[in-house]
Regions:
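Non-catalytic cap/lid and distal C-terminal segments of serine-dependent acyl enzymes
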Residues: 3-320
Length: 320
């Protein structure tokens, strides 16, 4: 069962830091309405100032702002992190958007891909399944036209945790014309060619992606591996022509992971990703991929990550 969506009433009052509201709009690529959770910085309604924007992903739009998402976060959310960074002067003001890349009940991950088999589920909120089009066209255009963003790639970032971290990196590699700054905490990154180097089984053996039922709506059953490679950041990177590679290299990437693998984290996937980044001359803004020596795959550590990555996004926006 998905956690209840709890945004305390005081979060809606703009005089206590930024305001958080749940919004929806009609997404033409999906043929349905989609919700998003919006953070507007303190004073937004009192000025005509424009702001950079960062899109935050996990699955459901509530997750980065839901005080009850898991017990580890102790009521602390992305709103608290952003308010404190802005108040301390470590970042300037930004608009933050928690977006939906899943069904309404969060049972079907949509991943920011144009799904192969969206009609295989009855879950509400999937629509046509064209989630890449939804993110790159509908959502960005809606946010830029509805709120006072700075509507430029130079002032737009994307970030995520777990599957949201995978999606953020995939978007940064596949659409470097849309984002200048990309972050990921403990992303469920794909192995290159879906070849999990930790074992010597018949390919493809990236079992998380090619065998679990979780992704059959997105990528078919059996999996269409050739299609999946179009959404594998490492395959995209290794096959990128020189001009596209230069665009990707212009993106600033901020990759961190939990300190463990298996059921505690995805550090080996992050290390694999960064090995290929290094081969292509792409730098990680963090020198150590571990968030902390004991970091876990939970919302407490995702909040700690956000404290670091929001500063990285702000630095990226300030350079351009």
């Amino acid at each position: 069962m998905a956690p209840s969506f709890f945004i305390p009433k005081f979060l809606y009052h703009s005089h206590i830091g930024g305001s958080v509201v749940l919004k929806k709009f009609y997404a033409s690529s999906l043929g349905i309405e989609k919700h998003y959770t919006l953070y507007l910085p303190e004073g937004y309604d009192e000025t005509h100032e424009r702001y950079p924007v960062v899109f935050f992903l996990r699955g459901h739009e509530r997750e980065w702002f839901n005080a009850r998402e898991d017990s580890s976060r102790n009521g602390r959310t992305l709103k608290h992190v952003a308010d404190e960074l802005i108040a301390s002067g470590k970042t300037g003001k930004m608009i933050l958007v928690g977006i939906s890349t899943a069904s309404v009940d969060n049972s079907v991950p949509c991943l920011g891909v144009n799904m192969l088999n969206p009609h295989a589920t009855r879950a509400e909120g999937v629509g046509t399944g064209r989630y890449e089009d939804y993110l790159t066209h509908d959502l960005i255009q809606h946010i830029d036209s509805t709120y006072r963003t700075i509507p430029s790639r130079k002032k737009r970032g994307i970030d995520g945790f777990s599957l949201g971290g995978y999606t953020a990196v995939m978007m940064g590699v596949k659409h470097p014309d849309l984002f200048c700054s990309v972050g990921s905490y403990d992303g469920t990154h794909m192995w290159y060619d879906f070849d999990d180097v930790r074992h010597d089984d018949e390919l493809p053996d990236d079992y998380t992606w090619v065998r679990t039922d979780f992704f059959k709506v997105a990528f078919g059953e059996p999996r269409d591996i050739a299609y999946m490679k179009q959404y594998n950041p490492l395959n995209l990177l290794m096959n990128a022509p020189p001009d596209e590679l230069e665009k990707i290299k212009s993106v600033q990437f901020h990759i961190l992971a939990a300190a463990y693998d298996g059921n505690k984290g995805n550090i080996e996937r992050a290390e694999h990703l960064l090995e290929f980044f290094e081969k292509k001359g792409i730098k990680n803004s963090f020198s150590d991929v571990k968030l902390t020596p004991t970091a876990l795959h939970d919302w407490h550590h995702a909040n700690l990550y956000a404290e670091k990555t929001l500063q990285k996004h702000w630095q990226a926006f300030s350079k351009l």
